[in-house]
Amino acid sequence: MLFPISKQALSCPHFDSCAGCSHQLFVEPPIWREVIENFKETLNPILHQGTLTGWRCRAKLAVRGTKQNPIIGLFKKGSHEALNIPFCLVHHPRINQAVTMIQNWMERHQLNPYQEHSQAGDLRYLQFVVERASGKVQIVFVLNFKDFSSPESQIWRKLLLELAQETTNAFWHSIWVNFNPHATNTIFTDKWEKVWGEPYLWESFDGVKICFQPSNFAQANLDLFEKLLKKVKSWVREKAKVVEFFAGVGTIGLSVAAKCSWIKCEEINPHSKECFYYAKQQLSSEISQKIMFYTGSADENLNLLQGADTVIVDPPRKGLSRKFIEGLTQSSVDQLIYVSCGWDSFKKNKETLISQGWNLKKLEGYSLFPGSEHIELLTLFER
């Protein structure tokens, strides 16, 4: 159910020009109509919606403009011209506050925003992440340098350390740099450095503590995602033997581990392993000894399926490969919990799974990105 907020209160002042939202917040995601139509003969899909404003705890914003007038925001619709969005309704209030602080700080120190046409300038992007329990903000500066070896980059290092001291300890969680000197639209490279602050940002999901670094994937709408996690846990059978593919830092796997006989978590991003093990250490020895972590792609780790009866997947938008589905079907697994962030790929995967003997038993939608066409699907297949 939508929260009873007036349409006027949900009308974003940036909507007409900003590319961040495809429709106003008070409008149900149009793609949900297609989901309902697709399954109306077999299922009765439920759409879960949380709060519509202030939900985004994580934001990546472009930095453009000039020394005198830095712009921190998203690109205008149909262009690569950046737009300030100081009154963004979906941002956590701390993010909007942090953006204003950084703009003023850049003006004061006459710092150079990135210029796409010339590939000049220093600061390309910013990422802001709010730790829910403390309200502190982790900030990442994506700098147009290869490292901190040049005199210009050393000026930035000095200013970032000063920035940490300019505000109270209750505001910044940590200050990080990602070095990206390449002519690319890719925001982050693999080169990270913590300049100041705490090494890990911690979140608690139904009593299970999970930690993140800026290089790790995490959902932006954590409050609603926590409800999805609880439903996943309710679907996992007692004493299940589970393999989770595309596990990230283990948010799902660690959350359901208490119900399992054992759980193996697989993730391709090598940066996830460190956070996974730190979070694992927070669990009791009785639970932590059930949990194993493997690095590599899902297709390369199909041998993990041996002896399992349950698989949990949360793949990227391209979905599951045919090789993965074939390996899954040839295994002993009889329960598949599929978290999908790509409707088009899910439709194809669903048809392939059904053709190989799987039955779709349950489907729920989670509007993790109000204002967008994006719907997260939580589904249960059995055979």
From Swiss-Prot:
[4Fe-4S] cluster binds at residues 12, 18, 21, 88. The active site is at 341 (nucleophile). InterPro entries: MeTrfase_TrmA_AS, RNA_M5U_MTase, SAM-dependent_MTases_sf, U5_MeTrfase_fam. PROSITE patterns: SAM_MT_RNA_M5U, TRMA_1. GO terms for molecular function: 4 iron, 4 sulfur cluster binding; metal ion binding; RNA methyltransferase activity. Keywords: 4Fe-4S, Iron, Iron-sulfur, Metal-binding, Methyltransferase, S-adenosyl-L-methionine, Transferase. S-adenosyl-L-methionine binds at residues 219, 246, 267, 314. One of its GO terms (biological process) is methylation. Its EC number is 2.1.1.-. Gene3D superfamilies: 2.40.50.1070, Vaccinia Virus protein VP39. This is Uncharacterized RNA methyltransferase pc1998. It comes from Protochlamydia amoebophila (strain UWE25).
